[in-house]
């Protein structure tokens, strides 16, 4: 009897550790990405961030499935996100985008300084996004289920994923100053999206057991196969699609609101003539 109890205790402890191991995997990927950037291995750094996105999606899901969520897990996950999806992609964006520019020395120097500020701003916006998410999670535990299916502001892994996917698509660092300027505009826009109030879909409660589970599994298998064969293109398309999804939904809602205010009964009042 005691052996059975000890076995159940060990099993529970093991289940509790699983989400933390995934979070540690996220931290490892972030550290590996940073060291790869320092060595000039930009594609390796990008791949590490991509793997970290997978780990980040697994830890919370495992914690919910095993009922092993804890305040410790929430805090270490936030710290891991700052390092892996804040510091690592900011360094990658800076060194890949501005570390090899071919331009007049004085102009190139000013551009690098501006890029440094922009990449630091990305890190700050990412940290603010995580802080806002944590405070909203605490205050909305009794909120309707709808709030759990939407993020307020673009999640920081999405911004990091787009940076990593772009570098993975073209690992050669940017040399043209005009493209470097465009890259800094993109980083600035990602920073804005993280601290904005634009809603983004959350896949935290995506359930494969629903009625379309076979179709979902088939699509997942197809996506894995496509990523294996055409990772550069597919990952970039996925990253751009998610980042654009919030903007698309916001645009549609604004369009409907505008049309709703224009197409009132007074609009078609024929007594004005």
Positions of PLM-derived features:
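Hydrophobic, well-structured mid-protein blocks that either form specific transmembrane helices
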Residues: 118-156
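Topogenic membrane-insertion module of multi-pass membrane proteins
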Residues: 1-57, 238, 249-250, 259, ...
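Helix-coil boundary and interhelical linker segments in multi-pass alpha-helical membrane proteins
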Residues: 32-47, 90-120, 166-183, 229-233
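C-terminal membrane-associated helical module and adjoining short loops/tails
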Residues: 1-7, 141-273
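Multi-pass membrane catalytic core of lipid/isoprenoid biosynthesis enzymes
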Residues: 18-24, 65-133
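Alpha-helical transmembrane segments of polytopic integral membrane proteins
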Residues: 31-34, 51, 55, 89, ...
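C-terminal ends of transmembrane helices
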Residues: 61-71, 127-142, 195-204
């Amino acid at each position: 009897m005691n052996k059975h109890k000890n076995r159940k205790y060990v099993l529970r402890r093991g289940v509790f550790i699983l989400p933390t191991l995934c979070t540690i995997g996220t931290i490892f990927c972030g550290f590996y990405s940073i060291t790869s950037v320092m060595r000039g291995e930009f594609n390796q750094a990008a791949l590490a961030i991509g793997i970290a996105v997978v780990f980040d999606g697994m830890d919370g899901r495992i914690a919910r499935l095993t009922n092993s969520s804890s305040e410790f897990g929430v805090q270490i996950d936030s710290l891991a996100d700052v390092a892996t999806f804040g510091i690592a992609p900011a360094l990658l964006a800076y060194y890949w985008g501005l570390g090899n520019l071919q331009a007049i020395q004085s102009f190139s120097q000013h551009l690098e300084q501006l890029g440094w500020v922009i990449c630091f701003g990305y890190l700050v916006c990412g940290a603010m996004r995580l802080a806002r998410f944590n405070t909203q999670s605490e205050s909305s535990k009794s909120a309707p289920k709808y709030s759990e299916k939407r993020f307020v502001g673009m999640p920081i892994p999405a911004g990091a994923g787009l940076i990593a996917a772009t570098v993975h698509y073209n690992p050669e660092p940017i040399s043209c100053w005009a493209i470097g300027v465009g890259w800094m505009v993109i980083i600035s826009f990602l920073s804005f999206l993280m601290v904005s109030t634009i809603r983004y879909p959350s896949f935290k409660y995506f359930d494969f057991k629903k009625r379309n589970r076979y179709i979902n599994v088939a699509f997942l298998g197809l996506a894995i196969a496509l990523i294996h064969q055409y990772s550069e293109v597919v990952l970039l398309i996925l990253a751009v699609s998610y980042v654009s999804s919030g903007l698309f939904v916001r645009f549609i809602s604004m369009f409907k609101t505008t049309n709703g205010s224009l197409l009132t009964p007074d609009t078609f009042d024929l007594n004005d003539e």
